[in-house]
């Protein structure tokens, strides 16, 4: 990871603290993973505070595949089976079947509809019957040990929400460039400056958790 690009954001602990402050204020954060892994940056919001405007930004500036990171317990509560029985994707990303809110949506594709789906899935008393399957929001199952178990954006998202004292659920989408290619660290830093969002890495979250 090119730490010089991240230097303006402080050290690892300072970068995580800045992200936690932003999340508590209902703002987005940008998380980059290891260069020898996916080497991509995700725009992440708290599912609890997510707005229609933020979802529209995710759809407009990112890949469009908006994912909802959930804990093991919530996946079980909602009875969401894996998308496939034999997950042989390169990094073992734990997609479940896609979902849609049963009520309050039309086609399910609009920013407002996707927010409605997210809110239905994270509601305190959410039940399996509250969601239709398939849909236009893609849940991801986070490993219980977080980034200390798997250094993925899914685990990083849930860890950040827990550390921020929020519900342990977040939405993410990979930041892309206008030509459809993936944004790397230099572009992620530029995006963060444009949108006043903190930038941090999965490695930062690992360091933060190990320091506690």
Swiss-Prot record:
<feature type="binding site">
    <location>
        <position position="42"/>
    </location>
    <ligand>
        <name>D-ribulose 5-phosphate</name>
    </ligand>
</feature>
<keyword id="KW-0456">Lyase</keyword>
<dbReference type="Pfam" id="PF00926">
    <property type="entry name" value="DHBP_synthase"/>
</dbReference>
<feature type="binding site">
    <location>
        <begin position="150"/>
        <end position="154"/>
    </location>
    <ligand>
        <name>D-ribulose 5-phosphate</name>
    </ligand>
</feature>
<feature type="binding site">
    <location>
        <position position="38"/>
    </location>
    <ligand>
        <name>Mg(2+) 1</name>
    </ligand>
</feature>
<dbReference type="GO" id="GO:0005829">
    <property type="term" value="C:cytosol"/>
</dbReference>
<keyword id="KW-0686">Riboflavin biosynthesis</keyword>
<comment type="pathway">
    <text>Cofactor biosynthesis; riboflavin biosynthesis; 2-hydroxy-3-oxobutyl phosphate from D-ribulose 5-phosphate: step 1/1.</text>
</comment>
<keyword id="KW-0479">Metal-binding</keyword>
<dbReference type="InterPro" id="IPR017945">
    <property type="entry name" value="DHBP_synth_RibB-like_a/b_dom"/>
</dbReference>
<feature type="binding site">
    <location>
        <position position="153"/>
    </location>
    <ligand>
        <name>Mg(2+) 2</name>
    </ligand>
</feature>
<keyword id="KW-0460">Magnesium</keyword>
<dbReference type="GO" id="GO:0000287">
    <property type="term" value="F:magnesium ion binding"/>
</dbReference>
<dbReference type="InterPro" id="IPR000422">
    <property type="entry name" value="DHBP_synthase_RibB"/>
</dbReference>
<dbReference type="GO" id="GO:0030145">
    <property type="term" value="F:manganese ion binding"/>
</dbReference>
<protein>
    <recommendedName>
        <fullName>3,4-dihydroxy-2-butanone 4-phosphate synthase</fullName>
        <ecNumber>4.1.99.12</ecNumber>
    </recommendedName>
</protein>
<feature type="site" description="Essential for catalytic activity">
    <location>
        <position position="136"/>
    </location>
</feature>
<comment type="function">
    <text>Catalyzes the conversion of D-ribulose 5-phosphate to formate and 3,4-dihydroxy-2-butanone 4-phosphate.</text>
</comment>
<comment type="subunit">
    <text>Homodimer.</text>
</comment>
<feature type="site" description="Essential for catalytic activity">
    <location>
        <position position="174"/>
    </location>
</feature>
<feature type="binding site">
    <location>
        <position position="174"/>
    </location>
    <ligand>
        <name>D-ribulose 5-phosphate</name>
    </ligand>
</feature>
<dbReference type="GO" id="GO:0008686">
    <property type="term" value="F:3,4-dihydroxy-2-butanone-4-phosphate synthase activity"/>
</dbReference>
<comment type="similarity">
    <text>Belongs to the DHBP synthase family.</text>
</comment>
<feature type="binding site">
    <location>
        <begin position="37"/>
        <end position="38"/>
    </location>
    <ligand>
        <name>D-ribulose 5-phosphate</name>
    </ligand>
</feature>
<dbReference type="GO" id="GO:0009231">
    <property type="term" value="P:riboflavin biosynthetic process"/>
</dbReference>
<keyword id="KW-0464">Manganese</keyword>
<feature type="binding site">
    <location>
        <position position="38"/>
    </location>
    <ligand>
        <name>Mg(2+) 2</name>
    </ligand>
</feature>
């Amino acid at each position: 990871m090119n730490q010089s690009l991240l230097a303006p954001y402080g050290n690892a602990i300072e970068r995580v603290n800045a992200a936690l402050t932003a999340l508590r204020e209902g703002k987005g954060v940008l998380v980059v993973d290891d260069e020898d892994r996916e080497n991509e940056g995700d725009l992440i919001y708290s599912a609890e505070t997510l707005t229609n405007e933020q979802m529209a930004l995710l759809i407009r500036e990112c890949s469009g595949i908006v994912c909802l990171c959930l804990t093991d317990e919530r996946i079980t509560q909602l009875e969401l089976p894996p998308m496939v029985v034999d997950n042989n994707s390169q990094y073992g990303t734990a997609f479940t079947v896609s979902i849609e809110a049963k009520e309050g949506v039309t086609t399910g594709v609009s920013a407002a509809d996707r927010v409605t789906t997210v809110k239905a899935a994270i509601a305190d008393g959410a039940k399996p019957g509250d969601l239709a399957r398939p849909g236009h929001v893609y849940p991801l199952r986070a490993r219980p040990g977080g980034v200390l178990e798997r250094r993925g954006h899914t685990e990083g998202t849930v860890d950040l929400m827990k550390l921020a004292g929020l519900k342990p659920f977040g939405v993410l989408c990979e930041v892309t460039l206008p030509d459809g290619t993936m944004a790397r660290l230099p572009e992620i830093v530029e995006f963060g400056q444009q949108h006043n969002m903190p930038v941090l890495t999965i490695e930062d979250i690992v360091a933060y958790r190990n320091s506690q």
